[in-house]
């Protein structure tokens, strides 16, 4: 398959928006010539889905997707793995791409951080990127001619009674996952993770680029002169509160 044929088929099928570009994180311009393509095989954001679990057994289909995607750039296709864990065979045994092991806490899984350290963008440069599940979707299009935007998502957060993985489709109503599954109290429901997701209502839909639904307590209660208190029940990364004396303690964090 040539680059022109791949682009034409992706545009005709409606799957082209799966491919985004940096800078700016917008849908890629099919007329551009990207210097490289990035795929982050892991998400380091809080409670994010574990791609190593999701991709168990999808080795051949994922490789087909990589072969197709690699035709879109004359540069390298970077597949970035979590160096702190053992990656799924679909990732660690991938061929025809440059495999990079990334170490460290969040935001190590952020595509912008990875681009900055591996292939920095200069003036006039464009880099395309997509997610591992996007690669599978594109592979299915060319293998079976299917427009298949099914995906595996994680429903997470301390307000969720039964956190688990679900197979669903892009844009589905989140009611299917949170009905009778929320703890008591006012909840902040997020399409995506708590750091970069979007606030949504109970009858809204899952974002097109999201693989996670998060529900945490809404921080709608204030504490009088709370800044004066020792803060044994408040998490602090910088040791502002005395909670640092109990480093193993777990916190139920809200929007405050």
Language model segments and positions:
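Buried, small/hydrophobic-residue-enriched core segments of structured protein domains
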Residues: 1-256
């Amino acid at each position: 398959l040539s680059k022109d044929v791949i682009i034409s088929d992706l545009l005709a099928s409606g799957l082209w928006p799966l491919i985004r570009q940096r800078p700016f994180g917008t849908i890629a311009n099919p007329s551009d010539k990207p210097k490289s393509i990035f795929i982050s095989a892991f998400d380091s954001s809080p409670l994010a889905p574990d791609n190593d679990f999701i991709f168990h057994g999808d080795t051949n289909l994922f490789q087909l997707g990589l072969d197709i995607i690699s035709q879109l750039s004359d540069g390298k296709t970077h597949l970035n793995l979590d160096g702190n864990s053992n990656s799924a065979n679909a990732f660690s045994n991938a061929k025809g791409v440059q495999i990079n092991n990334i170490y460290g806490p969040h935001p190590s899984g952020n595509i912008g951080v990875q681009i900055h350290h591996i292939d920095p963008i200069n003036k006039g440069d464009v880099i395309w990127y997509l997610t591992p599940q996007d690669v599978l979707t594109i592979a299915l299009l060319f293998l079976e001619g299917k427009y298949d935007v099914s995906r595996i998502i994680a429903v997470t957060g301390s307000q969720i009674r039964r956190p688990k993985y679900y197979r669903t489709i892009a844009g589905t109503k989140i009611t299917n996952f949170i009905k009778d599954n929320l703890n008591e109290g006012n909840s902040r429901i997020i399409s995506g993770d708590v750091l970069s997701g979007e606030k949504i209502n109970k009858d809204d839909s899952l974002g097109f680029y999201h693989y996670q639904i998060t529900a945490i307590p809404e921080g709608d209660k204030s504490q009088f002169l709370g800044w004066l208190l020792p803060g044994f029940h408040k998490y602090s990364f910088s040791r502002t509160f005395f909670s640092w004396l109990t480093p193993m303690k777990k916190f139920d964090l809200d929007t405050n």
